[in-house]
Amino acid sequence: MGDINYEPVIRDMTWSYSRIKSFEDCPYRWYLRYIRRLKGKDLFFASYGTFMHKLIEAYYTEGKTSGELCDTYLSEFKKRVAGHAPNKKIFSNYFTSGFQYLKNIHPFPYRPLAIEKKVEFHLEGIPFLGYIDFLGEQNGDIFVVDNKSRNLKPRTKRSTPTKTDEELDSYLVQLYLYSISVEQEYGRHPSALCFNCFRSPLFIEEPFSKEAYKQSKEWLVRKVDEIAEETDFRPNMEYFKCRHLCEMQDYCEYYALSQKKR
């Protein structure tokens, strides 16, 4: 693999936050998916998140009631959520928390501007594509909302950032990148970036930071350069990620080995 130059192919790609994060998780997984273009399998966490996103979207775009959403959740869960959770406790937690959120669902505190809004832009010649789950407005201010199955924590505001602060910042990068398109369309950046952590349930509203915005743009350019210059695409063999998060496991020569390294 090291003697083949994939840079022209990589430079010609349209980028997304998930495409870059896939490389950070495992360069070989990225190679299988985006260079060899193999079709991955549906797994529990990803398909659960997709199912919940579709139901929340239907609440706003189709006017579905809580009762209708709960009925769909119960009747279609087995069909729409593929794979297996790591254990029964995790399955029960995800299933129950999803149902409870839909049972008590209520509108975000903003006037909807767009649902599942497609965003496209170029940054230093890099084409980028994404989708904003919910774009809202309140008193002239714009808010970007992302629905998350991940249980993020609000910023602690401690002098030294905690691990949960760092995790929040890593997820905020995606919304800062989406803000490039928002600024291009509306002439101003969002006032806040928000996470609807529906399993908690917790709604996090993070004030927009111009410095973090600048750093996110730099991150995009830096990561694309890093991926374009990659030649080895080495695997990152972590038991949990390989077994429960990697959709390429059926094609991966390292998968069996990753399951032994516990």
List the predicted regions and their residue ranges.
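RecB-family 4Fe-4S metal-dependent nuclease core
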Residues: 1-262
